[in-house]
């Protein structure tokens, strides 16, 4: 049976820990200049229906460093953008390529693609989940803190794909997670209900960012209006007033807390310049670790 990386809920704690271990190994080799062309001679299709900076660059570079050939495909240059059924594209690409990464809108698109693909499919981002990013975030926490268990994670802002994936991660890995979201901007209800049934740790939601951040080891946020929600920007600015990660809010967390943001950041909205540039920020390590985590995911699925 073909294995895919579509959402964290497919994986056990042990499987995710194994990916973190492989990430560390590949990162150390890369820093030492030791080649690891594990996927020599293979080809990986990178399908983008949403524009990207970090996802595209990190996947293209990662595929190259693993010895494979990346094929960038946008909706404007593929038949998917003209209405070809997902199942048809999936079947054909599987005949040409050894793996596929998709960055798109609906989670149902990557799931249908995987259902009809005979090669591994990786979720590069959907409106529901962003599993590669959360894996990079968690690996960054492991690097800085030495662990994730026993820590309190805080999420401040929109209950978006990042928040949904953090909820899944907390339920699977067993760390405490406190979310602060305005009314009407909560995480996906199905994801929330699944996590509440599965979790052995504390996963809570509040309207008060101070309550969520207080005594946190890791504080995380994201933009108030995600891609495709630009027309809601003004309404969201009103709804998210008081949800900015500034120095006063971060001061409520533990003195050695980490601040994360998946980028791009709208400085002065969800996070201030002083916080993202400050000593608690691990944002740039987090961005780099997208490369290493995604290499581990591809290596584990495609080798």
UniProtKB/Swiss-Prot annotation:
Its EC number is 2.1.3.3. Pathway: Amino-acid biosynthesis; L-arginine biosynthesis; L-arginine from L-ornithine and carbamoyl phosphate: step 1/3. L-ornithine binds at residues 161, 222, 226-227. Keywords: Amino-acid biosynthesis, Arginine biosynthesis, Cytoplasm, Transferase. Its main location: cytoplasm. PROSITE patterns: CARBAMOYLTRANSFERASE. Pfam families: OTCace, OTCace_N. It is found in: Cytoplasm. The keyword Metal-binding does not apply. It comes from the Bacteria. Reversibly catalyzes the transfer of the carbamoyl group from carbamoyl phosphate (CP) to the N(epsilon) atom of ornithine (ORN) to produce L-citrulline. NCBIfam families: orni_carb_tr, PRK00779.1. This is Ornithine carbamoyltransferase. It comes from Geobacter metallireducens (strain ATCC 53774 / DSM 7210 / GS-15).
């Amino acid at each position: 049976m073909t294995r895919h990386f579509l959402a964290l809920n497919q994986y056990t704690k042990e499987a995710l820990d194994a990916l973190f271990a492989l990430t560390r190994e590949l990162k150390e080799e890369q820093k030492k200049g030791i080649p690891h062309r594990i996927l020599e001679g293979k080809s990986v299709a990178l399908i983008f229906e949403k524009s990207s900076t970090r996802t595209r660059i990190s996947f293209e570079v990662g595929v190259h460093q693993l010895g494979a050939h990346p094929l960038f495909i946008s909706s404007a240059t593929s038949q998917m953008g003209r209405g070809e059924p997902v199942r048809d594209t999936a079947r054909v690409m599987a005949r040409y390529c050894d793996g596929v990464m998709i960055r798109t809108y609906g989670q149902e698109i990557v799931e249908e693609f995987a259902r009809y693909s005979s090669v591994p499919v990786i979720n590069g981002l959907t409106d529901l989940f962003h599993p590669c990013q959360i894996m990079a975030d968690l690996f960054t926490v492991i690097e800085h803190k030495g662990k994730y268990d026993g820590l309190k994670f805080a999420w401040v802002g929109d209950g978006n794909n990042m928040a949904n994936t953090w909820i899944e991660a907390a339920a699977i890995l067993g760390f405490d997670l406190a979310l602060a979201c305005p009314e009407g901007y909560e995480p996906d209800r199905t994801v929330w209900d699944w996590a509440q049934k599965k979790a052995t740790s504390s996963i809570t939601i509040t309207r008060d960012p101070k309550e969520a951040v207080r005594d946190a080891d890791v504080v995380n946020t994201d933009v108030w209006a995600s891609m495709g929600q630009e027309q809601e920007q003004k309404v969201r600015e009103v709804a998210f007033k008081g949800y900015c990660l500034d120095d006063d809010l971060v001061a409520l967390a533990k003195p050695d807390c980490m601040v994360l943001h998946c980028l791009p950041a709208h400085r002065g909205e969800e996070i201030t310049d002083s916080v993202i540039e400050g000593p608690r920020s691990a944002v740039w390590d987090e961005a780099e670790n997208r490369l290493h985590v995604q290499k581990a995911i591809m290596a584990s699925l495609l080798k």
